Amino acid sequence: GIGGAGMSAIATVLAAMGHHVSGSDLKASAGLERLRALGIDVTVGHRTENVGAVDVVAVSTAVPSTNPELVAARDRGINVVGRAQILAAIAARRRTIAVAGTHGKTTTSSMVAMVLRAAGVDPSFIVGGDVNEIGGGAAWTAGEWFVVEADESDGTFLELPAEVAIVTSVEADHLDHYGSAAAIAEAFARFLHSAPCTIVCADDAVAARLGAEAGAVTYGTSPDADYRIDALVVERAGARFRVVHDGAVIAEVSLPIPGAHNARNATAAVVTAVELGADLKPVVEALARFGGVARRFQFRGEAGGVTVVDDYAHNPGKLRAVLDAAGHGGWRRVVCVFQPHLYSRTAAQGVDLGAALARADVVVVTDVYGARESPKPGVTGMIVAAAAIDARPWRRLAYLPHRGDIVPYLHDVLRPGDLCLTLGAGDITSLADDLIPMLASRTGR
């Protein structure tokens, strides 16, 4: 799975550290070409012969135990490790800043890395998305700090040796692994208690409670936050705000990306810089030019008066944040195409997903993108669609389980001045490749 965002970032860092790295993925991609350019031996397709004379085989969570390369490695007695074990080994070589949360961690970890880089801290980093400023999600430097996105999905984020632990949010996600909201909250509590320095968003109820128990430094719009977001203005093209600490304004921030959630993410980066003793002037300057992360409110194009934006949002908290940002843009309408991700998440959170989508003016729900999971009887995108209708019965909604029906439907629905959002962690991101040419070819709209 070397082509995925997380594994490709790890491969990049391992190669920069001087290791010989090879890997495979199911299909060709720009990410694979980028790895090849770094001298990494990349193969398309999973085959036994790909496992050469190696010491360690690292595997992503998306790879099944029946994968031929994985089977071959185990048969030969090669050490097989997961993503978290590799990350922990890398983190052990540096002072580590780990960013966790059920939403916001990719953008926050990217911002932390970029502002510390600007402030001369020169951190190494691995994040779960391509940072637009550098065209990738990883770097290995001579600096003493390492910024890492800590994935909570399977509990392995607890293996990271964090000196600074940041929690952006905690909601009842990944219930296929944790089983309950209480269990995931307990995992985050352990994460916070394992680090000597903890930074937590005060605007998230569960995170704030866990932070109080851990003695964390807090940030957010809450009046109780140690670092308070003040005078927040959210617009189509960005956000402006001040950071207040101990009654004094310590930073005036102008972001080129929209959303109150991104103001929170940026404030987490400011707080981290303060905790590390960095100069805030270059930090604020870095945030002013922060170009975002791939698939996080990413502008894909404009045609026929319609703006198309893609986002990775796939749980209720992420959907609410993205649609809140869209709501401040002054668009004629917000038209949302949502692809549910994982059967387990759809079964557990379908009602909440639908309620979050009710913020849009027009909603299209596709069938579930199963990823690593097999279909479950009775679990389809219709669960989400029905919940969205229940939440706002007068809103226009279509359930279109077949991908080929979506663009023709949008041909008849979209109007100049609309924002069209494609949302989900699956292959819905490629819809823009078909949608934008269609919009460009229309006449009379």
Question: What is the predicted role of each segment?
Answer:
Residues 1-40, 53, 57, 65, ...:
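ATP-dependent carboxylate-amine ligase
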Residues 25, 121-133:
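Short beta-strand-centered segment that lines the nucleotide-binding/catalytic pocket of NTP-utilizing
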Residues 32-34, 50-59, 63-82, 87-88, ...:
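Acidic, Mg2+-coordinating active-site environments of NTP-dependent enzymes
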Residues 61, 127-128, 169, 202, ...:
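Short secondary-structure boundary segments
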Residues 97-99:
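Hydrophobic anchor at the beta1->P-loop junction of P-loop NTPases
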Residues 106:
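Residue-level recognition of phosphate/Mg2+-coordinating polar/acidic sites
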Residues 139-142:
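Conserved motor-coupling elements within RecA-like helicase/translocase cores
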Residues 145-153, 308-314:
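Switch II (G3) loop of P-loop NTPases
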